């Protein structure tokens, strides 16, 4: 382990918390400061679209109690001077560092008049709206956030319309067969689907679509993706392009003392021909925060590449949907277990005959098997 005296971690969500925990557990005993834009202790985001909307507020991440006094909550990094190794905060304070972990996350894309769901405050505000008696909820975007909000709203007895620009919800992430099944699953559970069209404007409860139609709803919620929080790095000298560009080891490109982790990190993945990827899911932030911290302590020459197989899981109307790898890179997909008509199946995705992704619906054991095959670079 190389000698570092001061480490700053920017971002107090999952990746930042895991970085702090790992630094201490790996023996770093120098000055360690965690900067978090939110006033809350680090919390789990996946429940925000599920249990929090139903009334649960206990989402604190295990390990948050380990943070101690060197945690600046409610403070935001606004500038990085990589030359002088200084992070500038929104109150004018300057934090010097020998090592820096960039885990500043991402923020939701917004549309005027639309509720978004990223923070605990977002979830509590949306819950208050649901509790106020709104009967018809319109969800923009059928990704995992949109699907979970639609599920929760139906559980609460609300009428739900889901608008998605693709041919089926989650078509890009799940592939044609699983996305087609998901569309039917939504409809069987009472969700009205409007697909293949974009929302262009929301005024009050009026939602205008790209084809000229206007839909009405009491409450409009958006799950339209996120944008990485990199503006504070402008002028820092770090390479930024849809995230912080990194080496395979998560070191910021060209840097020997800055690493990145979580939603903000974009790095070349060896399983995919060193294609640059950025992953926005819980499991990636969980693992990447720890690996980035270990690599920062080890130094660039001893750092290990991060090559975990990306994976995520969601529950939609009682069905467990899991993915591994990057199905959207495939030129072939094939059902390899179960049957979509029986609501239990697994799909393998390949490019040039080699597995690159998998999707499983109510088939966790098949997903585990396929994930191992992806990591091994096996043929479909």
Set out the residue ranges of the language-model regions:
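Beta1-alpha1 glycine-rich phosphate/pyrophosphate-binding loop at the start
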Residues: 2-72, 150-173, 369
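A short, polar/charged loop-to-alpha-helix boundary motif
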Residues: 364-378
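Mid-to-C-terminal Rossmann-like scaffold of FAD/NAD(P)H-dependent oxidoreductases
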Residues: 2-5, 266-364
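Rossmann-like dinucleotide-binding cores of NAD(P)H-dependent redox enzymes
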Residues: 134-136, 144-200, 308-316
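Short loop/edge segments at beta-strand edges and connector loops
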Residues: 73-75, 81-82, 118, 164, ...
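Glycine-rich Rossmann-fold phosphate-binding loop(s) that bind the pyrophosphate
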Residues: 11-14, 37, 118-119, 140-143
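FAD-binding core/adjacent interface of flavoenzyme oxidoreductases
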Residues: 2-8, 60, 66-138, 208-210, ...
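FAD-site-proximal beta/loop scaffold in flavoenzymes
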Residues: 112-134, 205-208, 213-291
């Amino acid at each position: 382990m190389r000698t570092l005296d001061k480490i700053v971690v920017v971002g107090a969500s999952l990746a930042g918390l895991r970085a702090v925990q790992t630094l201490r557990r790996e023996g770093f005993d120098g000055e360690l400061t965690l900067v978090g834009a939110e006033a809350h202790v680090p919390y789990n985001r996946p429940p925000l679209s599920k249990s929090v909307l139903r009334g649960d507020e206990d989402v604190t991440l295990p390990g948050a109690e380990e943070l101690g006094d060197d945690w600046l909550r409610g403070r935001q990094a606004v500038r990085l001077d990589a030359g002088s190794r200084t992070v500038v905060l929104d109150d004018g304070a300057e934090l010097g560092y020998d090592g820096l972990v960039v885990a500043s996350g991402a923020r939701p894309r917004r549309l005027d008049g639309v509720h978004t769901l990223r923070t605990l405050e977002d979830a509590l505000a949306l819950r208050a709206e649901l509790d106020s008696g709104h009967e018809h909820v319109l969800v923009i975007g059928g990704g995992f956030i949109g699907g979970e909000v639609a599920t929760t709203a139906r559980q609460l007895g609300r009428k739900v319309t889901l608008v998605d620009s693709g041919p089926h919800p989650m078509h890009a992430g799940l592939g044609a067969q699983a996305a087609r099944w998901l569309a039917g699953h939504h409809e069987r559970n009472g969700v009205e689907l409007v697909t293949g069209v974009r929302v262009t404007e929301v005024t009050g409860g009026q939602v205008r679509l790209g084809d000229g139609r206007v839909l009405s709803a009491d409450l409009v919620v958006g799950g339209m993706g996120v944008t990485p929080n990199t503006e504070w790095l402008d002028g820092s000298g770090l390479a930024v392009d849809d995230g912080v560009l990194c080496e395979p080891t998560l070191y910021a490109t060209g840097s020997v003392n800055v690493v990145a982790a979580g939603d903000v990190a974009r790095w070349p993945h060896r399983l995919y021909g060193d294609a640059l990827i950025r992953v926005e899911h819980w499991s990636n932030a969980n693992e990447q925060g720890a690996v980035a911290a270990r690599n920062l302590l080890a130094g660039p020459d001893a750092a290990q590449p991060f090559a975990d197989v990306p994976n995520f899981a969601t529950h939609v109307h009682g069905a467990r949907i899991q993915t591994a790898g990057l199905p959207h890179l495939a030129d072939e997909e094939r059902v390899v277990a179960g049957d979509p008509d029986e609501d239990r199946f697994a799909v393998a995705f390949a490019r040039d005959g080699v597995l690159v992704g998998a999707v499983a619906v109510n088939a966790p054991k098949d997903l585990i098997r396929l994930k191992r095959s992806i990591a091994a670079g096996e043929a479909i």
